[in-house]
From Swiss-Prot:
Binding partners and assembly: Monomer.
Lineage summary: Bacteria, Pseudomonadati, Campylobacterota, Epsilonproteobacteria, Campylobacterales
Originating species: Campylobacter hominis (strain ATCC BAA-381 / DSM 21671 / CCUG 45161 / LMG 19568 / NCTC 13146 / CH001A)
This protein's GO CC annotations: cytosol
Enzyme class: ligase
Binding site for ATP: K240
Primary gene name: gltX1
Gene Ontology terms describing biological process: glutamyl-tRNA aminoacylation
Protein name: Glutamate--tRNA ligase 1
Subcellular location: Cytoplasm
Reactions this protein catalyses: tRNA(Glu) + L-glutamate + ATP = L-glutamyl-tRNA(Glu) + AMP + diphosphate
Ligase recorded as keyword: yes
EC id: 6.1.1.17
Amino acid sequence: MICTRFAPSPTGYLHIGGLRTALFNYLYARANGGKFVLRIEDTDLKRNSVEAANAIVEAFKWCGLDYDGEIVYQSSRFDLYKKYIQKLLDENKAYKCYMSKAELDTLRAEQEARKERPKYDGRYRDFNGIPPKGIDPVIRIKAPLSGTIEFDDGIKGSMKFNANDILDDFIIARSDGTPTYNFTVVIDDALMGITDVIRGDDHLSNTPKQIVLYNALGFKIPKFYHVAMINGSDGRKLSKRHGATDVMEYKRMGYLPEALLNFLVRLGWSHGDDEIFSLDDMKKYFDPNHISKSSSTFNQSKLEWLNAYYIKNSSNKRLIKELKNFNINIENHPKKELLIDSFKERAKTLADMAKGIDSLLSRPKTYEQKAFNKFINENSKNLLQKFSEILDAQNLKAKEIEEKTMQFLEKEGEKLKNLAQPLRVAITGTSVSPSIFEVIEILGVNEIKLRIENLIKNKESL
């Protein structure tokens, strides 16, 4: 059975690249009826954050990514790691190294002077003497001194490394006894039955070391898939300088989780020419063998397009609920359905939608200077005044308002744009709004007449 995992370190928020990695692992497991587990790699007790760990779980919940079983925390497994470190020591596959920091620094300087790659020289590999006093040893694995390390990467294909070029007897336990990253990963992946590891190709250099440990411990090596990085629009690795990278920041900016997942799954994976994928579609079609070898580019416009699509196709009931996160509560508004319909067609984010609704429902305290100067003059004021006087019937529907308005304009010999733009300024304080006919139905005749009156009386229009 396929078993995948997502194993973040809780030293910060869950970033976009991490969510894509989690999504790929999740989809591969679900597409094959397998298991997907969440493991928190919190062995670095100094840098760990409970808040960060909780934020990862919160992001999973928001995105609808469920995991199997309980969350595994590495910090609760130190005894297990010590057991396997001792096993390697007992089998003479690892050893204690008493080399001091000063000795390591000297060795590194000498190697760099000779233009050699800095690496540990193995001086304690077969040490049988009396250990030096005052030094707490690290534990090093006995890495192969020659030969090659090979594996078939599901994305990059056949990978081959010369052991002597890339390996030394690397540390598996620090001098304080805490295990290192590569060691804990191997122990946990093996004991948790992880069959496939999909991760960023920044981990490619770790893979030979982990294979050494799998072989030393007699564990089965999982299938590796190393995914190319996500780049910003400038071709450099995605970072904060390109905008938000925190997954939950996208929620706060008004993106829907299904839009974000749809966007991320297409960063490196494709299924024909399709662009729109529900989570169920992804589960049905996802195959890691179809992940591109090339880096993908984070395209903000594409994300906005997808988000607009999902907003447009969301139920009004859901959008009304989502807007409460932006302090917009229209649950009891008599025209809530029309209000949502008027904005969902053109909104790129929920934040945009909330801002538009708030602008519409709140009487303008000021007027956008550019719009005011362009559309408000003596002629437009007179036209607004006359239009206000014909708004006498209550509870008119948008279609009826449109008919009444067109009759008025025909009588006055005016075009719609000569009324619509000044009316938008009067209603919202800007030149932007949904259809003025829908706006009049939403706000009601009395409110429209009041806003027209307020604009005409405004000192800026004198």
